[in-house]
Amino acid sequence: MEWGPGAGWSRGEAAGVDRGKAGLGLGGRPPPQPPRDERAQQLLDAVEQRQRQLLDTIAACEEMLRQLGRRRPEPAGGGNGSAKSGAPPQPSVSARGGLPKDAGDGASES
């Protein structure tokens, strides 16, 4: 039972990774990296920059929505409803031959 979870192997050893070379680049040397604090600061700066970009994008979208709202003060549904409010929709659609039953009637007459 040497292979069980209690065999005393670390995860790196179990995966065939030599503990001394874990995370090392070619030639056994670590890849060049800035010190940990400097790297953390770089990541924090990148996150803050991305956050500013997203906030700018949101602000631009909100401005576009405001401009669209000024151009079209009436909702899209309200414009369509007011155009048809005087007549029932059924006769106007059937007069244009838009209903499937009209297409069937036309085919039987010819």
From Swiss-Prot:
Coiled-coil regions listed in the entry: 38-68
UniProt xrefs under Pfam families: DUF4726
Keyword list, A-Z: Coiled coil
Region: Disordered, residue numbers: 1-41, 65-110
Database matches in InterPro entries: DUF4726 (IPR031714)
Signal peptide per UniProt: none
Annotated protein name in UniProt: Uncharacterized protein C1orf122 homolog
Species this protein is from: Mus musculus (Mouse)
Lineage: Eukaryota, Metazoa, Chordata, Craniata, Vertebrata
